[in-house]
Amino acid sequence: MAGLKQHSGLVVPLDAANVDTDAIIPKQFLQAITRVGFGKHLFHEWRYLDAEETRPNPEFVLNFPQYQGATILLARKNLGCGSSREHAPWALADYGFKVMIAPSFADIFYNNSLNNHMLPIKLSEQEVDEIFHWVWANPGKQIHVDLEAKTVTVGDKVYHFELDEFRRHCLLEGLDNIGLTLQHEDAIAAYEKKIPAFLR
């Protein structure tokens, strides 16, 4: 899996707090257990005017022409609250988001996002508000995220964020739980050789 070292992308300014996982991906779309195919249902209730998803809501920000192809989601506090369903980050990732920026995230959603190789960045409410105003004033312009330096560059301003070093290492190297285990493959093989045959 490719690592996430630096990323430049368009930002969708979702000007809402307490966006829960039911809003991100409604329960009627949770039958599948694979990670693909959820992107088209992302924010279903807000994004479409009909249940069949044939009539996009022109007033929902994800449908605005200037934000098509966006890979960074900007939101207010407590993003991903509600149930612990992992389908929420699956839907965001399948849509194409790689980075999320908010003042705070629900704990389980935050961890699930990292496990699915998306970067949730916590900045202060004032900093997030500044970025909202910049995005509104600069449609079509990208911002730059540098995970190695732990910075977000918006126009001529640089914001610094914190991330647990273990989580940062996993994102930089593109490692999931299996990948982490395989980093110790030689040590595991050496240990297995020491185990008596009848215990193998």
UniProtKB/Swiss-Prot annotation:
Reaction(s) the record says it catalyses = (2R,3S)-3-isopropylmalate = (2S)-2-isopropylmalate
Q: Which GO terms describe its biological process?
A: L-leucine biosynthetic process
Q: Which GO terms describe its molecular function?
A: 3-isopropylmalate dehydratase activity
UniProt pathway annotation: Amino-acid biosynthesis; L-leucine biosynthesis; L-leucine from 3-methyl-2-oxobutanoate: step 2/4
Keywords, comma-separated and alphabetical: Amino-acid biosynthesis, Branched-chain amino acid biosynthesis, Leucine biosynthesis, Lyase
Lyase listed as a keyword: yes
Gene Ontology CC: 3-isopropylmalate dehydratase complex
E.C. no: 4.2.1.33
Q: Pfam families, per this entry?
A: Aconitase_C
Tell me which Gene3D superfamilies the record gives. Answer: Aconitase, domain 4 (3.20.19.10)
Q: Which family does it belong to?
A: Belongs to the LeuD family. LeuD type 1 subfamily.
Subunit structure as annotated in this protein's UniProt entry: Heterodimer of LeuC and LeuD.
Role of this protein? Catalyzes the isomerization between 2-isopropylmalate and 3-isopropylmalate, via the formation of 2-isopropylmaleate.
List the NCBIfam families hit by this protein, alphabetically: leuD (TIGR00171), PRK01641.1 (NF002458)
Name the PANTHER family for this protein.
Answer: 3-ISOPROPYLMALATE DEHYDRATASE SMALL SUBUNIT, 3-ISOPROPYLMALATE DEHYDRATASE SMALL SUBUNIT 2-RELATED-RELATED
Question: Can you name this protein?
Answer: 3-isopropylmalate dehydratase small subunit
Lineage per the UniProt record: Bacteria, Pseudomonadati, Pseudomonadota, Gammaproteobacteria, Pasteurellales
